């Protein structure tokens, strides 16, 4: 990797009280302590052997989608948008409304047919690869605001998306929104046309004998009209949901159309006693001022849904052993912190800071330091 390469890098660890970035030595010490906490609280991981522990930079693209909003697009395609949107009726059915229908039974049959069709799951599957979900994206906002231009000296993961890919994702997203607006328009037009048809039919129910038939027609029309309104409401909710997947440029303090941010995270590979490989991700976190005795590491998440979803999604993707898994593992092994003398010195200074700041009880500091040393010596042997 070119040591002179630079990029906009978001921190892995910040203080909760003021979002100040934690210095590198303290960051490494606390993130490894968090890893140890994560490892020891799962019985099946306690006897596992470390393979690597690395800091990695995950490529995140923020690209303008519309006048003010930005989509977050994952450069490694861990994430995607999978969704069902409401469709309109088969256009062949609409032609029947143009026919001249003069008898009551045929009118009721037609309206009943529309009701039956509308009761079907009129849905279309949508999948847009790479879009990051709102829980992750909103959770990253504080970090994105703290991102700064830095040398890319950590384990930079090469993005698998080109500028053309990013534009294609935005176009797909915009097309889905446009399609939903068009579907709303179609439902409105159908509703208006149907209402006019019913209005024309009403005048033909003029005598006393037709009152029961007119009542039946009105009831069927009211039922159908209500269902059409529900479809329109569904479409509007789907549009609102899709808008929730984007962030305002004002929220991000961004004005340029395409922004690339590197999100700092830590990843460990371990071998379980049954020889299965497992990956443990440490997403960006905060140094909390409120840690209980049962949770002895002073590191917590920005909010639980962000941390949990990001951690589980990436770990599951890596555990599935895709070609991307091997690419990331090879990259992390090449930057294995257990094997770097600079990292050993850095973490020693970090635990000295932890002790001075009284961030952890001394007994836990010694356990974690011992585990680092054992892993380092084992992998160097």
Where would I find each of the regions flagged by the language model?
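Soluble extracytoplasmic regions of secretory-pathway and membrane proteins
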Residues: 1-381
